[in-house]
């Protein structure tokens, strides 16, 4: 019982300690005692299992907790559970809450780490894809009941604030040409153009990200500034796209460098772009 609920019941006279105004000196009439069976405790939710699929909206996918119903992986779905781990909620001998920074940092580092091995391909393939991971943990109430799991979901970003339907199992998908073609990072126009939108290559597009360039950090690991980030990939991207072009003397290329917000989120590299015929 929560403190709020207990206070409400006391106010309504439904808990001991309330006075009903009757004469306490009179002998109360005997009343038959009723034997009641206490209700059975609620069954805890089952622990998630890897290999299950879910139909999530974009908003649900980025929420901290979500009570998702499992759907058949043969049906339409936007998320697949690829890893289930156990939360460590004890720090220096003391329990910490499931929504504490310490616990959430554990999950936010575990899921991206597990994703790379699950999807296959190279680190570059993952950078050049629209596949990502979101993670869920029990609510505070579920944690209090003893649930200590966290689950990692693989999703594909289809476009701005939109998830792409997953095309079959995703295990090892970036190790295949078909997987890289479906889930690759593409654009509706040249990066920097007014009508540019980043989309999965399964969607209509005219440009494709074909390489990445690491950007050297500034002092103390800080964002180096837009000028330095821009300069970092110009020649590399030009060479990358030249090697892919039908005519190495006549081709178009693009370079998209990280801004300060993207840098703070962990993207310390830029993208090389090439038009698609």
Locations of regions flagged by a protein language model:
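Short, conserved catalytic or interaction motifs in soluble domains
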Residues: 20
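C-terminal motif of bacterial Sec signal peptides marking the signal peptidase cleavage site
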Residues: 14-17
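N-terminal export and membrane-targeting signals
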Residues: 1-10
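Intrinsically disordered, low-complexity regions
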Residues: 11-12, 84
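Long, compositionally biased stretches enriched for glycine and/or charged residues
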Residues: 23, 27, 32-277
């Amino acid at each position: 019982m929560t403190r709020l609920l207990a206070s409400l019941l006391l106010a309504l006279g439904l808990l001991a300690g309330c006075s009903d105004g009757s004469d306490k000196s009179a002998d109360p009439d005997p009343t038959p005692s009723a034997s009641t069976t206490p209700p059975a405790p609620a069954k805890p939710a089952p622990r998630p299992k890897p290999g299950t699929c879910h139909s999530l909206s974009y908003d649900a996918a980025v929420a901290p907790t979500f009570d998702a119903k499992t759907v058949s992986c043969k049906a339409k779905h936007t998320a697949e559970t690829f890893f289930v781990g156990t939360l460590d909620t004890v720090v220096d001998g003391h329990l910490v809450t499931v929504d504490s920074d310490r616990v959430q940092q554990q999950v936010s580092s575990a899921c991206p780490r597990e994703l790379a091995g699950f999807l296959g391909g190279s680190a570059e393939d993952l950078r050049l894809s629209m596949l990502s991971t979101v993670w869920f943990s029990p609510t505070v109430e579920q944690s209090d009941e003893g649930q200590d799991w966290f689950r990692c979901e693989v999703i594909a970003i289809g476009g701005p604030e939109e998830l792409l339907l997953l095309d079959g199992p995703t295990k090892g998908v970036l190790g295949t040409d078909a997987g890289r073609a479906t889930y690759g990072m593409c654009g509706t126009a040249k990066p920097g153009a007014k009508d540019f939108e980043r989309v999965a290559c399964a969607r209509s597009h005219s440009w494709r990200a074909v390489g990445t360039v690491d950007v050297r950090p500034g002092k103390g690991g800080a964002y180096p500034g837009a000028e330095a980030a821009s300069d970092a990939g110009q020649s590399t991207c030009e060479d990358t796209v030249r090697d892919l072009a039908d005519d190495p003397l006549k081709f178009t290329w693009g370079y998209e460098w990280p801004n300060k917000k993207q840098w703070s989120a962990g993207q310390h590299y830029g993208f090389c772009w090439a038009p698609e015929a």
